[in-house]
Amino acid sequence: MNARLLILVYVTGLTAGASAKDDASLEGVVQLPPPTVERALNQRYGTSVEAPLTPSNPPAAVVYLEGASTTNAKPKSGDIAQMAQKNMLFAPDLIAVQTGGAVEFPNQDETYHNVFSYSKAKRFDLGRYRKDEKAGRVVFDKSGVVTVHCEIHDRMRGTVLVLETPYFQKTDSAGHYRLDHLPAGHFTVKAWINEADVREHVVDLKSGARSQLDFPGK
């Protein structure tokens, strides 16, 4: 269906002494696709693992702000995201980091995993490791979409969305998001669901204002 852009602006008063520079906020709902259900048999290295008929990770989107003034902030020192291997899935299977951010890939299963990616934005291979071994860590120094796989269990698939902007948030399972402490100005806001489904709108953010922006389904 045709996307409708709904922007409701609520002007709020600034507290005394508060800076208006990064005092805008944006919230809304992304209409998400239905969850997927998978069943697979993996047989490698002399082992056979059958995945039960259960839902994968619930659908989610990453909502982020693009524009000239969104690339100034750097990742916070020590911030490390995690994408675990659990129940033969990447959990969560979608995360976002700012360029220069790090991600750990802990193994929480009772079997070997081997996390790797051949994506242009980041190529890596962490090798085989078990639950009781140190989790591999990767620094993502180039923006782009990084698709993550397990070399042993080929049904496993995850995505690391590496962004230049520090202004992003992953939605909850119902599609809700909220971005706070945003700069005022003219920006493009994108909702990334997968490489085939990226929705975007243009928004003018005002200092001290709260705006609502929804992303209906296609």
Predicted features and spans:
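Positively charged n-region of N-terminal signal peptides that target proteins for export
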Residues: 1-5
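Bacterial N-terminal signal peptides
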Residues: 6-15
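Extracytoplasmic copper-binding redox domains, predominantly the cupredoxin/blue-copper superfamily
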Residues: 20-218
